[in-house]
């Protein structure tokens, strides 16, 4: 919740890490061990991408972190902006990105295992995450510059900084397909190494409902941020 009102670029990302770690612990707590590990795996990609993007913004603005002073950076930093948006969509849980599959798998297991309270908190948290991440995106890259002197000299970062952003963004998009590979995808692969049996079965109707609800909640969060 601290990220909802914070204006420090790096602190918002740091606070978001806490909630994502919470999802991992929820996964383990409800018996969805492979889902928790999958979220750890996907989180490494999108959080690495987000922090590198924030570093690119800092480089362009001489270390400035206050997003209330930014705005209008999209036209000056298209690569950074687009890769930042990929990371934000990922952490918000928008399909078909991997963050959607890993987070929704955890929430689905929480629901079908009877932990409805935990599922509800996780779903609300997903909406909050979408809100504060896109609040950051809109304040940083869109609208008019709120500090014209700060923004007027901004420029895209050099290739040595933007190439890793592109590689991570493309890699992260490809990681999303790990969830839908044959034999259970990533989770099926992890399950082979787990001795403990996971809880939760295959409930197609419930799964479809939960997926739709999760996406709607995330889109509402993005809409409120806009």
Go through each PLM region and give its residues.
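Acidic/proline-rich low-complexity IDRs
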Residues: 1, 193-195, 212
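Membrane-interfacial helical/loop segments at transmembrane boundaries in membrane proteins
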Residues: 102-109, 181-206
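Intrinsically disordered or highly flexible coil/loop and linker segments, enriched in small
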Residues: 95, 146-147, 179-183, 222-226
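Hydrophobic transmembrane alpha-helices and their helix-loop junctions in integral membrane proteins
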Residues: 1-157, 169-171, 177
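Glycine- and aromatic-enriched alpha-helical transmembrane segments of multi-pass membrane proteins
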Residues: 162-175, 203-226
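Serine/threonine-rich low-complexity intrinsically disordered regions
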Residues: 72, 80, 147, 157, ...
């Amino acid at each position: 919740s601290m990220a909802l009102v914070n204006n420090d670029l790096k602190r918002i990302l740091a606070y978001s890490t806490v909630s994502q770690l919470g999802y991992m612990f929820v996964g383990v707590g409800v018996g969805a061990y492979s889902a928790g590990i999958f979220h750890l795996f996907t989180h490494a990609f999108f959080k690495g991408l987000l922090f590198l993007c924030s570093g690119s913004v800092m480089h362009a603005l001489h270390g400035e972190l206050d997003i209330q002073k930014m705005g209008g950076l999209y036209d000056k930093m298209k690569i950074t902006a687009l890769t930042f948006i990929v990371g934000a969509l990922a952490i918000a849980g928008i399909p078909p990105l991997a963050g959607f599959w890993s987070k929704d798998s955890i929430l689905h297991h929480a629901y079908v295992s009877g932990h409805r309270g935990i599922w509800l908190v996780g779903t609300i948290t997903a909406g909050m995450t979408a809100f504060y991440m896109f609040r950051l995106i809109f304040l940083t890259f869109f609208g008019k510059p709120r500090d014209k002197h700060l923004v007027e000299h901004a420029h895209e970062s050099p290739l040595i900084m933007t190439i890793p952003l592109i590689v991570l963004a493309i890699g992260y998009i490809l990681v999303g397909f790990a969830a839908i590979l044959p034999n259970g995808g990533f989770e099926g692969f992890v399950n082979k190494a787990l001795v403990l049996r996971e809880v939760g079965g295959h409930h197609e109707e419930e799964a479809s409902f939960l997926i739709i609800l999760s996406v709607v909640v995330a889109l509402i969060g993005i809409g409120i941020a806009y």
